[in-house]
Structure formats: C-alpha cells, structure tokens
C-alpha cells in the first residue's frame, strides 16, 4: 500500500481488525495481502475492483503458491472489501480455492527417537521433546515461560495459542524430567528457552525449525516432513495407544463448534493418567 495515498484507509483497516481482536501477526498478513494485490494491479486500494482480485488470484496460482496460501490472501481481501470498504457483495465474487485433502506425513516412534538422539544441543533436544511430547506448535514451544510448567497438576500452560486461546497441554513424567534437567543446567529466568543473545527474550520458531532440520539430516531421515510433523506424530501415536479422539482434540487445542463443550468436560480428567508417547521412547542420555 502506498503510504501517502492509503494512510487513512490503512488506518481504518487496522482499526477494523483491532476491533475484532485480530492479533498483530494476522493484521500484518492481511495488510501485506492487500498491498501485494495493489502492487500487482498497479492500483490504490480504494480503486481495486473484483476483476483486479480475480486477476491477482490467478497470478498467485500461476506463481506456484499452494491453495492454502492463495486462500489466505483471498480471505484478507474479502475482509478488506466486506468490512473496510463496506462492500459485502464482493464476497460472492472472491472464491476460495478448493484445496486437495492430503494426509500429513508422520514419523514412526523409532524415527522420532533417532531424531531426538541426533540433536546434540540440550536446548534444542529439550524443545523438540516438548513439541513431540506435548503436541505443541513451534510458536507455542518457543513462547513457553518457566512458570508455564505446572508440575503439581502435570500440565503445561499454553497462553494465547492459535486462535488466541489459552489451554492446558499434557505434561508427562518423562517430559517433566527432561525439563527439570534442562532447568537445573541453565536456570532460565523467564523464558524456558531464552535467546542466546538476550536471556530476556525467547528463541524464535525459525531457530527451532533449523535445529529440527539439522537433526533430521543427522538422523538420516529422508521423509518430507517439517517441525509441525512432531505435532502430527503426537496425535497419531496417541491414537495408536487407543486414546479417545475427542481427548486428543482437547490436548491439541482444536475446536469444533458442535463438540467444544464435550472437549471442555473431558479435558480435566483426560490430562491425568495419559502416558505421553515420549514416555515410550528408549532414549540414550544426551552427550556431556
């Protein structure tokens, strides 16, 4: 968006998103999508037409973007037209791409063991153990504070996870031991995984992702997987342990409108007595 031309409109869009409690990351993503569309169509935001959006959508697809990435841009533009420009009619003309349903690739238990054992840094091995052992997203792992580990109730407090919802995640006995070993060695003051250059800030998802892929290479695992795969592994391995699917949805923080109340009721008792799949791994102690 051209700053001098669209400043008032940009401000209005930001206000529209703020009123609806969009987080900063979502706001930046929405603004970037509108700016990209304007740049491609060589128009100011208030001049955009439905035909411009259609051309932009085709352009994104031809550039090789995934359906989910294209849809993300279209959702942002839908919001811009419907809310900020007050043109709800535009919704009918900005379609959402139908994405193919693909099953996520998961690692076997032995592959997860190899991956963790191939992580030489105690910090990253602990962080990856949390990602798998509690089924957390990368942003949730790096954003953990020491105070989020509740050893009395055997839960990990996840604040403002995806969808800006707080939840409790599974803290198994073995994961607690791993976390205690890490804490005793480093005594982090606030963040569980502090930044090496600034102990009062946490590591980034990008750094954790790099550690994951480094370990993947060392372990000789050639599957097309990413850091989020550990979360898929957590859910899949629990299913293989015959844990009820509704319980798993609670542990992951997933939300379905028709079953939200059920998940809330079973979450309290579900967190006690469940063995994390991490507990079943036969891990060698870290070097040093």
Indicate residue ranges for each PLM-predicted region.
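Conserved catalytic core of the tyrosine transesterase superfamily
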Residues: 1-288
């Amino acid at each position: 968006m051209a700053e001098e031309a669209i400043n008032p409109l940009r401000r209005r869009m930001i206000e529209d998103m703020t009123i609806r409690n969009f987080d900063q990351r979502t706001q930046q993503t929405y603004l970037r999508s509108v700016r990209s569309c304007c740049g491609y169509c060589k128009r100011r935001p208030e001049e955009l037409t439905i035909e411009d959006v259609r051309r932009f959508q085709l352009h994104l697809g031809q550039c090789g973007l995934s359906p989910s990435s294209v849809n993300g841009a279209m959702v942002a533009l839908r919001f811009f037209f419907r809310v900020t420009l007050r043109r709800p009619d535009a919704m009918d003309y900005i379609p959402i791409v139908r994405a193919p349903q693909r099953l996520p690739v998961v690692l076997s238990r032995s592959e997860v063991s190899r991956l963790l054992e191939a992580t030489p840094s105690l910090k990253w091995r602990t962080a990856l153990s949390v990602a798998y052992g509690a089924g957390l997203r990368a942003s949730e792992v790096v954003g953990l504070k020491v105070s989020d580990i509740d050893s009395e109730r055997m839960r990990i407090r996840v604040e403002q996870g995806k969808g800006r919802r707080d939840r409790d995640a599974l803290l198994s006995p073995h994961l607690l031991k791993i976390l205690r070993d890490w804490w005793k060695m480093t005594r982090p003051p606030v963040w569980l995984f502090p930044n090496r250059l600034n102990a009062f800030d946490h590591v980034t998802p990008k750094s954790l992702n790099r550690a994951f892929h480094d370990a993947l290479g060392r372990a000789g695992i050639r599957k097309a997987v990413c850091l989020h795969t550990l979360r898929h592994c957590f859910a899949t391995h629990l299913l293989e342990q015959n844990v009820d699917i509704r319980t798993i949805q609670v542990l992951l923080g997933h939300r379905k409108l028709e079953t939200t109340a059920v998940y809330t009721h079973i979450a309290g008792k579900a967190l006690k007595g469940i063995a994390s799949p991490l507990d079943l791994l036969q891990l060698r102690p870290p070097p040093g």
